[in-house]
């Protein structure tokens, strides 16, 4: 008779462990969900601007990033793409950082601001980081106050 009586608890513990590991694997496979869009998309050209319209409730929904090997991050890239200024949102396996820079491509007569925002929670690449903007505002208010006193 299987399992033997003395191995009953060990057998149930092993079965429980296998079920637990399988359920954890399923959670890990689901991965991060990010907004994935591009302003150069001709079917829906206005769904992927720098800011989502309609009070930040976008027409698109975050997508599962399981098709990107090792995806752990969502990225929002704002800059000049294919002749126009716009945004791209995508899944990434690399932390690309958070920074802005001025870029001049070959043939350009001026510099264009290009920004990268990287985050690691579901749907976090909807907008840029507000902390940076609030920090700049606080610094300007402090400077204004100091100059007046």
Swiss-Prot record:
Subcellular location: Cell membrane; Cell junction, Septate junction; Cytoplasm, Cell cortex; Secreted
GO biological process annotation, one example: regulation of tube architecture, open tracheal system
Family matches, as Pfam families: QVR
Main location: membrane
Gene disruption phenotype: Embryonic lethal. Elongated and convoluted tracheal dorsal trunk with tracheal lumen expansion defects in stage 16 embryos. Some disorganization of chitin fibers in the trachea.
Modification after translation (UniProt): GPI-anchored.
Lipid attachment in record (GPI-anchor amidated asparagine): 125
Record bears the keyword Nucleotide-binding: no
UniProtKB keywords: Cell junction, Cell membrane, Cytoplasm, Disulfide bond, Glycoprotein, GPI-anchor, Lipoprotein, Membrane, Secreted, Signal, Transmembrane, Transmembrane helix
Record's bilayer topology term: Lipid-anchor; GPI-anchor
Function, as annotated: Involved in tracheal paracellular barrier functions mediated by epithelial cell septate junctions. Involved in paracellular barrier functions mediated by glial cell septate junctions in the peripheral nervous system, including the chordotonal organs, but not the hemolymph-brain barrier (the insect blood-brain barrier) of the central nervous system. Required for septate junction assembly, possibly by organizing the preassembly and transport of septate junction proteins such as dlg1/disks large 1, Nrx-IV/Neurexin-IV and the claudin protein kune.
Miscellaneous note of the record: 'Boudin' is an Anglo-Norman word meaning 'sausage' (specifically blood sausage) or 'entrails'. Mutant larvae exhibit developmental defects resulting in an abnormal tracheal network structure with the dorsal trunk adopting bulging cysts resembling a string of sausages.
Designated name of the protein: UPAR/Ly6 domain-containing protein bou
């Amino acid at each position: 008779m299987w399992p033997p009586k003395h191995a009953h608890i060990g057998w149930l513990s092993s079965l429980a462990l296998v079920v637990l590991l399988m359920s954890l694997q399923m959670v890990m496979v689901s991965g991060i969900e990010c907004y994935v869009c591009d302003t150069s998309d001709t079917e829906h050209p206005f769904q992927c601007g720098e800011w989502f319209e309609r009070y930040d409730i976008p027409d698109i929904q975050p997508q599962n990033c399981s098709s990107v090997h090792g995806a752990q991050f969502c990225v929002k890239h704002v800059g000049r793409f294919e002749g126009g200024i716009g945004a791209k949102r995508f899944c990434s396996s690399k932390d690309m950082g958070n920074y802005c820079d001025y870029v001049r491509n070959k043939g350009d007569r001026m510099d264009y601001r290009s920004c990268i925002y990287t985050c690691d929670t579901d749907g976090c690449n909807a907008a840029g980081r507000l902390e940076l903007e609030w920090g700049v505002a606080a610094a300007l208010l402090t400077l204004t106050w100091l100059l007046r006193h």
